[in-house]
């Protein structure tokens, strides 16, 4: 029996191959973890643009994430700022240079390939991969990193969205960005 006879093994090998093909397009200017951190910061909400959230997204230690963030800061791709209401909190923002680099993101090739899938296939793939990612995440550290839709913390009404977890009003755009505190609403 071939080592690729089982469907789960074939799928795992394909996922790994897709990852290698996508990483092969990455410019030498950034390491893979740096690309991932920069991508995350560009699509995360303001509550999630913090070193701990980046570490959770990268599934690494805070120390390793800190090294990645320092490299991005040295390259002028992100900047650190203190939170306006809590000076103990560090907020991370992509710079104009960082956002411009993302326009040349090597991941665009993979995004375009996925965009060519029939919508039902893309939806099924997204749901399946999210389930697999959830299963692989360390127990007790399973941030979903989704927008506000379907989150138990979202309080919406009267044209205003509010996050009960952070006790803050949210702009329309903010509700669509990745959040480290997303917790699926009970159905």
Predicted regions located by residue number:
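Terminal interaction helix/tail motif
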Residues: 104, 108-152
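N-terminal helix-turn-helix DNA-binding core of bacterial DNA-binding proteins
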Residues: 23-61
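N-terminal leader segment of winged-helix/HTH proteins
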Residues: 1-28
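Pre-recognition alpha-helix immediately N-terminal to the DNA-recognition helix
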Residues: 10, 17, 36-40, 100, ...
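Short amphipathic alpha-helical boundary/capping segments
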Residues: 20-31, 112-120
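Charged, amphipathic alpha-helical coiled-coil/dimerization segments
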Residues: 71-123
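Long, low-complexity, charge-rich intrinsically disordered regions
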Residues: 154-187
């Amino acid at each position: 029996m071939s080592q690729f006879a089982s469907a789960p093994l074939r799928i795992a090998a394909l996922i790994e191959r897709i990852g290698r093909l996508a990483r092969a397009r990455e410019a030498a200017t950034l390491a893979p973890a740096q690309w991932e951190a920069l991508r995350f910061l560009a699509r995360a909400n303001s509550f999630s643009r913090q070193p701990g959230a980046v570490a959770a997204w990268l599934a690494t230690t805070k120390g390793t994430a800190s090294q990645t963030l320092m490299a991005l800061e040295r390259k002028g791709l992100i900047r650190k700022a203190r939170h306006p209401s809590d000076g103990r909190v560090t907020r991370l923002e992509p710079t104009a240079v960082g956002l411009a680099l993302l326009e040349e993101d090597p991941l665009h090739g993979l995004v375009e390939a996925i965009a060519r899938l029939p919508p039902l296939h893309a939806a099924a793939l997204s749901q399946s991969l999210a389930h697999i990612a959830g299963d692989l995440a360390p127990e007790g550290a399973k941030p979903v990193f989704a927008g506000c839709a379907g989150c138990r913390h979202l309080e919406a009404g009267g044209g205003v969205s509010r996050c009960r977890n952070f006790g803050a009003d949210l702009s329309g755009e903010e509700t669509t960005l990745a959040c480290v505190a997303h917790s699926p609403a009970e159905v």
